[in-house]
Amino acid sequence: QGSMEPSEFNITRWLKPGENQIALEVYRYSDGSYLEDQDFWRFGGVHRSIHLVHTPDIRIRDYVVRTLPAVQGNYQDFRLLIDPQFSVYQGMDGKGYTLQAVLKDADGREVVNMVGNVEDILDLEHKAARMNEWYPQRGPRKMGRMSAVIKSPQRWTAETPYLYKLELRLQNVNGQTIEQVEQPVGFRCIEIKDGQMLVNGNSVRFRGVNRHEHDPYTARVMSEERMLQDILLMKQANVNAVRTSHYPNVSRWYELCDSLGLYVMDEADIEEHGLRGTLASTSDWHAAFLDRAVRMAERDKNHPSVVMWSMGNESGYGPNFAAISAWLHDFDPTRPVHYEGAQGVNGEPDPKTVDVISRFYTRVKQEYLNPGIPEGEDKERAENARWERLLEIAERTNDNRPVMTSEYAHCMGNA
């Protein structure tokens, strides 16, 4: 389940020599639909690409790429960390296989070249009694099986989206490359200090928009031309950030944000809306909540444009969101976590599971009424803060998290 998250299936055992037919059965609604109650038009069918992939018996299953300052607090030199993962079939053990990691700049010049031993990375002979430095008996698992310090790299920002290219080459015992994957790399560091969002040590103000995947002619199917048009409009309006409201977008969107420069708040496909916080507080739904966030983060973890995870939208708050926050922070300590529903009410502080204070539906002008408030009533919904209330929150001294308006100038009906 999860119509906006990636899915992958191993169909090897069902294939036969010659021509094969693959059939898809798509359900428009399921019990998972209770977590997809976003305010948008609902369509049936397949609206994203499907790929059939053939791989060797040892393959690069996944990899994590991170960039961190080589010295904490100094943004001159960066450390490149690569954590590869492999899948093996047919009894292979990886003996004699190597993984070559080559980083090139935008002009194709080689910056660094590293080689790792696949057998050591797989560590198939690991026994419980044997120490494993990457998955220790106590403490978190380590990152960076392959790492190098890059001297004075070009830094990635939304204004200067400089990208390097990382080539990962899996080579067999004869030195032949049997698989190669390429990953754009942007050297950047995201931090929160003293109530400010920092990119490479510099304070940044996000001037962002919410964006649905919606085309007047192709509905949910987003062409590259339409995505480029959206980014151009944002750039012309001095927009530097976008929230993937309210689900992970098609993969090509993140690639364009990497190369053209937009800060992305990547949002999980979770919105129970009319049920308020019922499901967020129900343990039966714990796995469904976590599954959607995990699949989002696993897919988008290597994009430099993704600077923040968002746990969802308008689903109340409860232990299921606390679980998502714990997983995201442990899986990826390099990005802050957002969720507009994690709000304190009646003077209570916002939960510590989020790294930013989020409010929405703020008035564009003071005289404008908030949504849902009858004219003439002097009443303020807790989640619809006035601008002066946001300023008050930002200036308080007992909570130094940045304040963000996750939605404003709300206009139902456009998507």
Regions found by a protein language model. Name each.
Residues A23-E25, K165-R169:
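Extracellular recognition modules
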Residues Y75-R130, L166:
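Beta-strand-rich binding/interaction modules
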Residues I231-L232, A241-A415:
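Substrate-binding/catalytic cleft of secreted carbohydrate-active enzymes
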